[in-house]
Amino acid sequence: NPQTMKQATLDLIGRHHTVDMVKEKFRMARDLGFDNINMDLIIGLPEEDIDDVRSTMEQVRELAPDSVTVHSLAIKRAARLNIFKERYANLKIQNTQEMIDLTAKYAREMGLEPYYLYRQKNMAGNFENVGYAAPGKACIYNILIMEEKQTIVACGAGTTTKVTFPAENRLLSKTVDIIPKI
């Protein structure tokens, strides 16, 4: 997932992928026959403005994903922007209605329709996250995850498995710190 198509921003926020890698892997997935590809974008990333959002949307439109999820920046506990917040204190973070409207306009132009919306804590601009999809390409998994109705099994160090118990309206989360030797 690209988050943005501005390389300077990816570098700033500590992402280890490049814009070129995103494009290359997207095309590779298409060449391998993947027919339902989503791209996650984040609006409100440090030092990005409306022109950067427009540039990202132009590049995403060229790739023609089957769905796009537009997230408003929410700084997570373990995010680089939170861990090193003193270093980033003077960075400009914008998330405006104009940016949100621009992403919706591009989604419509790409033939994508909104199919789910959710809010989370600590979101820049107090906006929401919106999933857009082409007809017949909506991902029910995304809806179930947001409603915490879907079990997620994670493998690897630092991952979190969530087990749902719908009949009991209960959720169990477990983070894997160390993988035991088998």
Predicted features, each with a name:
Residues 106-119, 153:
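Acidic/polar loop patches that form or flank catalytic/metal-binding clefts of enzymes
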Residues 64, 111, 123, 149-153:
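A generic secondary-structure signal marking the coil-to-beta-strand transition
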Residues 1-103:
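Conserved non-cysteine loop/helix-boundary elements of the Radical SAM core domain that shape
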Residues 3, 42, 118, 156-158:
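Anionic group-transfer/hydrolysis microenvironments
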Residues 131-182:
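Radical SAM enzyme core and accessory elements
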Residues 75, 122, 158-161:
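Short, solvent-exposed loop/turn segments at secondary-structure junctions
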